[in-house]
């Protein structure tokens, strides 16, 4: 598969590194030679110094026979123009990074397709949706719904009150449990567990279950005493903060703190009256306490500085806030942030990359999530007739090491999978796998 990535900024560089490990034919183009200099020598990809809006430059990188053209420069207009040109030169599919929500409205989708832009990616909106998912419940690190919530993936950290510590999973399976443990994150290692593995204190455990049994997962995880989120404090008035404030449920009260007065005035215009805008320094603990930090269930740090976000979440934790979320755009800091136990880590580069990665897959995939600090991916496949996954019961499929089937949705009903489950055409199957394994599992669904 020939993939051209236009823009060697943070998103483009991360995506190029990710895809180069897949042994795809990757070309990364940018008009800044300095950005490209270290990449070609360290990764299996070609770099070309050329403008993505130059017809000659696009011809040089071979846009005419590109299977996928991805424009992720910081400039929305350049991305749209580059995709239009690439399509007219012969590129089969194009993706543009944007920062304008209006472009995503369903009524505009066909309009952009006619212009030559097949898909639009808005990283800030994707990040905001991830944040809202993670703060819906204070006891959950990750929360993802499949097929409208028929099946749910929950990631939560094991504390002292957890009921399932130090018990082999095969013993837990002897009770007719309404969940499946799909992965365990322990220190810097992610395990796809087997029957003799045990859950230990401080592990982050990923469960799949149905909505009916979410309270049961909360009970066995020892999180029943965690307060439900009603009050949310956001530090930093970025575009992600705006989208987050717009997406939170109506029952949540939101405060945004930012030290730029002009930005605060702009936020007041953009957001409705239920969101309180405070002009002040979010690093000032006295200010945060005065604004009700001790009565806040969720604290979200979204400044442009990863270090500030990490430290602010640590401080909020010490003040008794049960749920903290930090935007950490420096990938090198993600592991450290997790080891400091700051809560949920958001990285829009990784979120964007996982959405684009989905477009490369040949099987019918409706959802791909990148679990950044777990080094794992979760994907929702739709099963086709005569595909390999339907030939045997799950226990006899011979799935690659590092992969597991978390559950399936059949006729709108979530089902927790066991070894004796027979997967049928039309099922929606949720697969959990270690990072970069999706292509290996994909062949089972073709």
PLM-predicted stretches and their roles:
Residues 1-446:
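Cytosolic regulatory regions of ion transport systems
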